[in-house]
Amino acid sequence: MEIIKNGKVFTKNFTFEKADIILDKGEIKDIIYFGNNGDSTNNSSDISGSTDANNNKSDNNYTRIIDANGLMVIPGLVDIHFHGCVGSDFCDATLEAVEKMAEYEKEHGIAAICPATMTLPKQRLMEICRNAKEYKDIQMNTKSLEKNNEQVNTSEKLKAKLVGINLEGPFISPDRVGAQNPEYVQKPDAEMLQELIDESGNMVKLVTIAPERGGAIECISKLHDKVRFSVGHTMANYDEATLAYESGAKHATHLYNAMTGLNHRNPGVVGAARDAKNVTAELICDGVHIHPSVVRATFSMFGSDRVILISDSMRACGMPDGESELGGQVVIKKGNEARLVTGELAGSVTNVYGCMVKAIEFGIPIADAIKAATY
């Protein structure tokens, strides 16, 4: 077993408490919190296999000891919307691409990923879904081997977990494609979406949709119990977006970007998402897509419970400056920006850990920023 000692641990109550964390085969087995007098007390009865706190006083019990004195210990981050990194893209539809992405993300503190597709032809999306299912099956088999104490390649443990697919296209507005290819935009189609869900083995978790498009509301009403619909890449006004949320949509794709903006007379998608109950909103906090003042305003409007930090990173993330590609389109990475040759922003080149750090730099309380990147 291993132990992380003396750290300020981010708890399920979104506060920091001094504690020791005991790990067994890379998983948390127990958390030993310290009382006001500095003595350790076991407050982790909800974690199976709890260890007597008194047994943790000897360092000889552990194969590895990490002294986190003066440091914060936080959960692994989650990125529910990114396309790629280190030269690979989810839409490459290869096991190698997903593996490289998962390795990079884990190296940067991201424990779980839900990578996004682009607006592409149906058959290409089917290939991407099949590839994700195959990768997930391999991932689950590895987990089964670990539980049975069978030999597992150590590298298998050093990858972020693939938890779903974010279908960012093709059911979007041709007038708000952003960096997507307008050639492959389609009207919302419940039958096609069901095929993609089936092909993925129910791995499709998020679906971006433009609610003003014909068939959108019907699609949301029919399938909202199977996937989480996200309003985005849309020209929808406040009323159209509100109808989508009333019909079962529960999310907003990269708030402010590729949608109608917030105006004092025309509140658009932003206003509708704010007013709808239980709707979460993505925020690309890379210092490029959103002004720091708007980041602060968004946390104030929505609250940390409803803001989800995302990276929306593309394959140039983690790579040197130069030419790259996104959805079949040429992208130029320069510094902390990635743009199409036309000048349109083409995703980010910052991972979600970097986005969390930016949020803190912009004045978001540390606990709120961590919460928005983990829960």
Language model: regions and residue ranges:
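N-terminal metal-binding scaffold of metallo-dependent hydrolase/deaminase domains
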Residues: 1-40, 44, 52
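Intrinsically disordered, low-complexity terminal tails and inter-domain linkers enriched
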Residues: 35-63, 137-159
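Active-site metal-binding motif and surrounding structural segment of the metallo-beta-lactamase
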Residues: 38, 59-74, 198
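Alpha-helical scaffold segments that flank or form the walls of functional sites
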Residues: 71-72, 80, 90-160, 184-199
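Divalent metal-dependent hydrolysis catalytic cores, especially in the metallo-beta-lactamase
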Residues: 83, 99-131, 160-173, 200-212, ...
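Active-site gating loops and adjacent loop-to-helix segments of metal-dependent hydrolytic enzymes
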Residues: 104-114, 173-201, 245, 249-255, ...
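Active-site core of metal-dependent hydrolases
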Residues: 198-319
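His/Asp/Glu-enriched, well-ordered alpha-helical/loop segment
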Residues: 271-281, 287, 299-311, 317-375
